[in-house]
């Protein structure tokens, strides 16, 4: 049965329409600008090693692995006995040293010298008597009326009397004029050093307690009670999961399309159908080659820029190191002020 020319023409028109639609679809798909930038990365791993500032024996651990801790929360204790003893020692001598300092700089300075006191006068009388005795023993020894030992004793007594007189005069001068400026300065410096020593002892006592430096989760409990610790020995490893961000790499051709503050959505194979809101918080100013650990659909030799996409993660579902996919819409996505 022959096909009529009318039907043949109609079929030809239908074929042309279908072919044109298919061609338009593929051409428009090829030339239409992308509406979303998709990049791949991992939740950045952030950790802190919690350690004491001094040496000592670990007395107690207050948290376990997996516990969520707050900044400033007590984590562990060192044996404080020797640190408390150091504080008690410095605190016991501090009042006496402080009183000596106050007595030193409060001595009045007199313009007129008073009459010699009884101590210099007594020392002067002792010296005069020692000189007379020395002269008498010297004359007797010249005639060999006394043994040489008596002459030596008289000489020693004379030297002692002179030294006592000098000491008494110096004490009188200090009582009259007060301490010298150099003595006051030295006493002040010594007092400051003692005060700093007491503060250091108290600080070392405070450092026998280990507090959490940031909010996080106890990832590793490295030591146990009874272990000896040092400032180089961490006691805990804390995983910091607030805030969390994605470390990803932006292709060079998309650099001009993505800006700081743009909204993004983050998805993970661990939560099918679930997306987490986020925003672009950092774009590296330096280009680099794609790291080997990053799995992307682009060529390995393509230049990329490291980006940081912050994620809203109130329930802590996004775990550190988790691989994720980031979608950054390019339409209706004005950068927000950070």
From Swiss-Prot:
Cited InterPro entries: CusB_D23 (IPR032317), UPF0194_transport (IPR050465)
Subcellular location: Periplasm
Signal peptide boundaries: 1-23
An example Gene Ontology CC term for this record: periplasmic space
Keyword ATP-binding applies: no
Residue stretches in coiled coil: 148-207
Keyword tRNA processing: no
Transmembrane stretches, start-end: none
Keyword annotations of the record: Coiled coil, Periplasm, Signal
Similarity section: Belongs to the UPF0194 family.
Protein's recorded name: UPF0194 membrane protein in asrC 5'region
Organism: Acidithiobacillus ferridurans
């Amino acid at each position: 049965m022959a096909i009529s020319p009318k039907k043949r023409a109609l079929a030809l028109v239908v074929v042309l329409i279908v072919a044109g639609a298919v061609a338009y679809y593929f051409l428009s798909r090829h030339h239409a600008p992308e509406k979303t930038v998709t990049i791949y990365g991992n939740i950045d791993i952030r950790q802190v090693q919690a350690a004491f500032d001094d040496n000592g024996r670990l007395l107690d651990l207050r948290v376990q692995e997996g516990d969520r801790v707050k900044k400033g929360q007590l984590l562990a204790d060192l044996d404080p006995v020797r640190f408390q003893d150091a504080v008690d020692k410095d605190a016991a001598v501090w009042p006496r040293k402080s009183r000596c300092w106050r007595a030193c700089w409060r001595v009045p300075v007199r313009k007129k010298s008073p009459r010699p006191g009884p101590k210099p006068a007594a020392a002067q009388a002792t010296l005069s008597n020692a000189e007379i005795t020395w002269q008498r023993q010297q004359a007797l020894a010249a005639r060999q009326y006394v043994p040489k030992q008596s002459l030596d004793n008289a000489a020693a007594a004379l030297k002692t009397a002179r030294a006592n007189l000098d000491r008494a005069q110096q004490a009188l001068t200090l009582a009259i004029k007060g301490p010298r400026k150099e003595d006051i300065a030295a006493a002040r410096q010594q007092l400051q050093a003692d005060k700093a020593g007491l503060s250091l002892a108290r600080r070392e006592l405070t450092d026998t307690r280990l507090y959490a430096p940031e909010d996080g989760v106890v990832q590793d409990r490295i030591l146990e009670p009874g272990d000896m610790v040092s400032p180089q020995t961490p006691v805990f490893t804390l995983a910091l999961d607030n805030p969390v961000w994605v470390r990803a790499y932006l292709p060079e051709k998309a650099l001009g399309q993505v800006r700081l503050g743009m909204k993004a959505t983050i998805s993970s194979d661990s939560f099918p159908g679930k997306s987490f809101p986020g925003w672009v918080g950092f774009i590296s100013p330096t280009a680099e080659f794609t790291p080997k650990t990053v799995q992307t659909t682009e060529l390995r030799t393509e230049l990329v820029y490291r980006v940081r996409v912050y994620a809203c993660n109130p329930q802590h579902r996004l775990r550190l190191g988790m691989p994720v996919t980031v979608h950054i819409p390019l339409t209706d996505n004005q950068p927000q002020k950070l």
